[in-house]
Amino acid sequence: MEINGISGVGMSTAFPLEKNTSSTSVADGAGKFFKELVGKVNDLSQQSDQAIQKLATGENRNLHETMIAVEKASVSFLFMSQVRNKALEAYQEVMRMPV
């Protein structure tokens, strides 16, 4: 009786590795993430400012739409600051690790 080893489940085909021509590191990915996050928060802030200006000039008479835009900008900024704080805490924790 021949005993064969357990064959692979095929995980390499289930989760193929991305083949990039340029080598990207985790730091590059994190930098790209934060850059996109700041850009989106900035866009929401600008939309909020535009909504306030339109309400003040009478171009837009819907106060609720303006308040929604302002709250979106506020919540997105708070989210961004919390993500920043968590990333900074993680960095500080890594720096405290003994070598």
Curated annotation (Swiss-Prot):
One MF term from GO for this chain? cytoskeletal motor activity
List where the protein spans the membrane. none
Q: What is its main location?
A: other
Localization = Bacterial flagellum basal body
Record GO biological process: bacterial-type flagellum-dependent cell motility
GO cellular component entries: bacterial-type flagellum basal body
Kindly state which keywords UniProt assigns to this record, in alphabetical order: Bacterial flagellum
* Matching NCBIfam families: fliE
Q: Into which family does the record put it? A: Belongs to the FliE family.
Annotated protein name in UniProt: Flagellar hook-basal body complex protein FliE
This chain's source organism reads Trichlorobacter lovleyi (strain ATCC BAA-1151 / DSM 17278 / SZ)
